[in-house]
Design a protein with these regions (language model features):
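Short beta-strand->loop structural element characteristic of the AMP-binding/adenylate-forming
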Residues: 52-62, 297
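Phosphate-binding glycine-rich loop
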Residues: 1-31, 44-49, 55-56
Length: 364
């Protein structure tokens, strides 16, 4: 556990920079394939460390990484793929994992918006976040479950687990749980760096780490939320399906979302894409909905490269690379928004949203 989903992404990436990984470690200047149409903290750790994000376009109406672009994005500097399952819709994990396995790359699944989503791979259903090398979750209040604030990482690799915990806990080499001592039975008998022989293992630091722990109180809230998670996921799915069914009559004006093939999404939101010939703009329908008390959200950054944080990098044309064009990414920036499928929404609330969207579309 950690204190946020963004911290989980930071720890996931930084774990792959550990010298303990030898030749597979990510070094400054190495490349990480990702997308610009997402939340910034999937990309932020890459840039902060000094690695190079390589942006590829996404698909519409899936809003996930376009796997046909992966080979074009690959170079002799590529070390990892780090992408999110957008609003609960899994990306094509089979294709991405096959690509990573072929080239010996790490795969980080940002699962912060997709807790409970599943994907059929290798003859069985698997939860997203458990298929790559590291998965991350967020327990921020709007997400599927919450701890007030909080996040988690999951991996089947014991070495990565210990590296992640080291970065989370100040960079210490010791892997004892809080309140425990001498788990390794060699606390005062080992040699590290140029320290004196037998220096206390609890105070040996193998990484330049952080303090990103979560409190016991938050963890207790998370345990209680886990009991409710199946019902939460089911309600989100039902709300999404209801919106999809009722809004389908506006398909001539709106592009509605589609789940990825071989997936069982645990939906975080409902994406609406305004067609070019709809007779109105994204901003106009968003303004109408907001004035009627219906909250809307952009699809996160839209195109992250267009934001002020990229001004200097964009001007100097350094620090990142774009593979091909980002046509769909730019379309998302201009034409896409999403509305909620919160499990506490009643049928009356959903009908109100549908009614207001219909009113607007009929008036144009």
């Amino acid at each position: 556990l950690t204190n946020s989903g963004s911290s989980a992404n930071l720890l996931a990436f930084m774990a792959l920079t550990s010298p303990k990984l030898g030749d597979r470690r990510i070094k400054r200047g190495d490349e990480v394939i990702t997308v610009a149409a997402g939340f910034p903290t999937t990309v932020t750790p890459v840039i902060q460390f000094g690695a190079v994000p390589v942006f590829v376009d996404v698909t519409i109406p899936g809003y996930n990484i376009d796997v046909t672009k992966l080979e074009d994005a690959f170079s002799d500097k590529t070390k990892a793929v780090m992408v999110a399952h957008t609003l609960g819709n899994p990306f094509d994990i089979a294709a991405v994992k096959q690509f990573c396995d072929k080239h010996g790359l790490w795969l980080i699944e940002d699962n912060c918006d997709a807790l409970g989503s599943r994907y059929f791979i290798d003859g069985e259903w698997k939860y997203t976040g458990t298929i790559g090398d590291i998965g991350t979750s967020s327990f921020y209040p709007p997400h599927h479950m919450t701890m007030g604030e909080g996040g988690a990482l999951y991996t089947n690799n014991l070495q990565l687990k210990r590296i992640i915990e080291s970065f989370r806990d100040w960079g210490r080499d010791c892997y004892c749980n809080s309140g425990k001592d001498d788990t390794c039975k060699r606390r005062f008998t080992q040699q590290f760096g140029e320290l004196p022989l037998g220096y206390d293992h609890k105070y040996v630091y193998s990484h330049f780490g952080y303090n990103l722990k979560v409190t016991d109180m938050q963890a207790a809230i998370g345990c209680a939320q886990l009991q409710k998670l199946p019902a939460i996921i089911d309600a989100r799915k039902q709300n999404w399906e209801y919106l999809r069914e009722k809004l389908s009559v506006y398909g001539n004006k709106l592009i509605l979302p589609e789940p990825t093939e071989n997936s069982d999404p645990s939906w975080f939101g409902f994406v609406i894409n305004v067609r070019e010939d709809a007779g109105f703009t994204r901003n106009e329908i968003v303004d109408y909905l907001e004035k009627n008390g219906i909250q809307t959200r952009m699809l996160f950054a839209g195109n992250l490269i267009k934001h002020p944080c990229f001004d200097e990098m964009r001007t100097k044309k350094e620090g990142y690379r774009v593979c091909g064009d980002l046509t769909n990414t730019d379309a998302i920036m201009s034409d896409v928004f999403w509305i909620g499928v919160y499990p506490g929404m009643t049928r009356k609330m959903l009908d109100f949203m549908i009614e207001k969207i219909g009113e607007f579309c009929h008036a144009r």
